[in-house]
Amino acid sequence: MYQNSLIDFNPYNSLSAVEVGKHLYWKIGSLQLHGQVFIVSWLVIATLLTLSFLGTRNLQRIPEKFQNFMEFILEFLQDIAKNQIGEHEYRPWVPYIATLFLFILGCNWAGALIPWKLIHLPEGELAAPTNDINTTVALSLLTSLAYFYAGLSKKGLGYFARYIQPTPVLLPINILEDFTKPLSLSFRLFGNVLADELVVSVFTLLIPILIPLPVMILGLFASSIQALIFSTLSAAYIGEAMEGHGEE
């Protein structure tokens, strides 16, 4: 009763309420999927595909306006891959690194900009997909598969010789490193996105409208940095797996 009266007194409280650990479950056989994560992820993917189509449907030799912006984004993402993977090996990995960056950025910004709490769900609430640990772990495991594939495609079975370099004594540590990389990637992204949403929610609860705006702007900046860090580290891990096999 007290909680309902508080929400009636201050309607912003309903927007600032945070539901942690509650999910809208979709059941497919014996599997339980987090429905709200898929809904927002599909919206982000649809938005990215739409922007890509609009930016490439009428390409001009001399780019103007939106095409110029899209080419700037592409060059920025190419530079990330080139700097981390190497000038001779980076091109095949640009689509993967670019997809990682744009998807994470879109998910983070979707959580920071769109008032999802206005959309009522039977259970849980819509939010940034990256504030769900399952999403960040899945992205991290994709990066793990990517750098294993990169190493094996360049070195063959000789890739596994890295585990006993520079000395076989380091074998356990080198194996452990392959587990810590995806763990650090996933928990860093998950923790920062969740913390940002919690901070904005708390400030909105305490002082509505005015004070949360600078915090939201800071959250957008932090969300962009997290997307950059994740994609840069992913490219660095791929480059490390292929190290020593570029052309001189």
UniProtKB/Swiss-Prot annotation:
It is a multi-pass membrane protein. Signal peptide: none annotated. Gene3D superfamilies: ATP synthase, F0 complex, subunit A. The chain crosses the membrane at residues 35-55, 94-114, 133-153, 202-222, 224-244. The keyword Metal-binding does not apply. The keyword Transmembrane applies. GO terms for molecular function: proton-transporting ATP synthase activity, rotational mechanism. Keywords: ATP synthesis, CF(0), Chloroplast, Hydrogen ion transport, Ion transport, Membrane, Plastid, Thylakoid, Transmembrane, Transmembrane helix, Transport. One of its GO terms (cellular component) is proton-transporting ATP synthase complex. SUPFAM superfamilies: F1F0 ATP synthase subunit A (SSF81336). It is found in: Plastid, Chloroplast thylakoid membrane. InterPro entries: ATP_syn_F0_a_bact/chloroplast, ATP_synth_F0_asu, ATP_synth_F0_asu_AS, F0_ATP_A_sf. Key component of the proton channel; it plays a direct role in the translocation of protons across the membrane. Belongs to the ATPase A chain family. F-type ATPases have 2 components, CF(1) - the catalytic core - and CF(0) - the membrane proton channel. CF(1) has five subunits: alpha(3), beta(3), gamma(1), delta(1), epsilon(1). CF(0) has four main subunits: a, b, b' and c. This is ATP synthase subunit a, chloroplastic. It comes from Pyropia yezoensis (Susabi-nori). The lineage of its organism: Eukaryota, Rhodophyta, Bangiophyceae, Bangiales, Bangiaceae. The gene is atpI.
